Curated annotation (Swiss-Prot):
Protein name (record): ELAV-like protein 2
Primary location: cytoplasm
Family annotation (InterPro entries): ELAD_HU_SF (IPR006548), HuB_RRM2 (IPR034999), HuB_RRM3 (IPR034914), Hud_Sxl_RNA (IPR002343), Nucleotide-bd_a/b_plait_sf (IPR012677), RBD_domain_sf (IPR035979), RRM_dom (IPR000504)
Single GO molecular function: uridine-rich cytoplasmic polyadenylylation element binding
Biological process, per Gene Ontology: intracellular mRNA localization; negative regulation of DNA-templated transcription; negative regulation of transcription by RNA polymerase II; nervous system development
Tissue-specific expression: Expressed in brain, testis and ovary. Ovarian expression is restricted to follicle cells surrounding the oocyte. From the early tailbud stage, expression is neural-specific and is seen in both the central and peripheral nervous system in differentiating neurons but not proliferating precursors. Expressed in the retina from stage 32 with expression becoming restricted to the ganglion cell layer by later stages.
Phylogenetic lineage: Eukaryota, Metazoa, Chordata, Craniata, Vertebrata
This protein's encoding gene: elavl2
GO-annotated cellular components: cell cortex; cytoplasm; protein-containing complex; ribonucleoprotein complex
Top-rank taxon, per record: Eukaryota
SUPFAM superfamilies assigned to the protein according to its UniProt record, in alphabetical order: RNA-binding domain, RBD (SSF54928)
Keywords for this protein: Cytoplasm, Developmental protein, Repeat, Ribonucleoprotein, RNA-binding
SMART domains: RRM (SM00360)
Pfam family name, one: RRM_1
CDD domains on file: RRM2_HuB (cd12775), RRM3_HuB (cd12654)
Amino acid sequence: MAVRLCDVASLLRSGSWAAEPWTGQVIAAMETQLSNGPTCNNTANCPNTINCSSPVESNNTEDSKTNLIVNYLPQNMTQEELKSLFGSIGEIESCKLVRDKITEGQSLGYGFVNYIDPKDAEKAINTLNGLRLQTKTIKVSYARPSSASIRDANLYVSGLPKTMTQKELEQLFSQYGRIITSRILVDQVTGVSRGVGFIRFDKRIEAEEAIKGLNGQKPPGATEPITVKFANNPSQKVNHTILSQLYQSPNRRYPGPLAQQAQRFRLDNLLNMAYGGIKSRFSPMAIDGMTSLAGINFPGHAGTGWCIFVYNLAPDADESILWQMFGPFGAVTNVKVIRDFNTNKCKGFGFVTMTNYDEAAMAIASLNGYRLGDRVLQVSFKTSKTHKA
């Protein structure tokens, strides 16, 4: 490891790599690791890494020997920087930073790099796996070809002790199989654990065994049993076509198929994965102690509910994005984007009505401070001080 890190650090100091914005940071990280010794390969004794284990064994297909998955990338790292970093090892055929489609291109913290030469892919794993960038320790391994045995192996875990660390969460679940990724959700303002986490296993059968063994059990430090279940049941995924059709009928009450609990937590996971580091910014329209306003009516809708004010929307924002963001938290009865009379462009704010207070409060807690494109949304219950439609 030390020799390879030295080689890469030397390469980065020379030639075209020296001008890259990330070069200094990578070199510093490599030099720190060289002075501290080899990167830890044992998760139990390595608190700063997440599943920092030996590379995944290679599959038999030729493509799998060149295609790598890179996890735990810094949130602000671009695809160009990812390509430059791995391009320092060898010639790359393709590189892709995975982005959130709903949030207009925000990085999800992982990507894929496909080399021309399998030897370069192997060298990249041996050289860059476990490298610490900013607050992240990146994990580099062979990407697995898609198959039924590895799909839907992501678990949602609730009821965790607020004091449980990510390392302890992995230790609890590691007895059932190889863990690919893990995460504990934290409050965006206080940083305190929300008692909810996610574990992704290498194979679905491992996830099934974890459910059998841990669902309803009390882990160390817990006062209540934890809930363990699949987080991404395909039958609970958002059907955007149906969602759009529902919106086309303004007098039809939204039945809330997106309110299923698993889907709600799945979106919550995505939001926290992508934007957990952003501090929430509260609406300039004062929130009067999470005041509820029952009986709010929008033009064309006579229902009652809890009205939510959404501020700092982009000029091209439309109602469908509000459906997509708020639907997973519960039953939505109406959405409205306020538009300029002359241009028909969004004036920067809109309203969402939800039938259940707890679901509305959860949506506010999760989406206030949420970055949509280049804008940070401000979400609160509608008050008398809020803009009027």
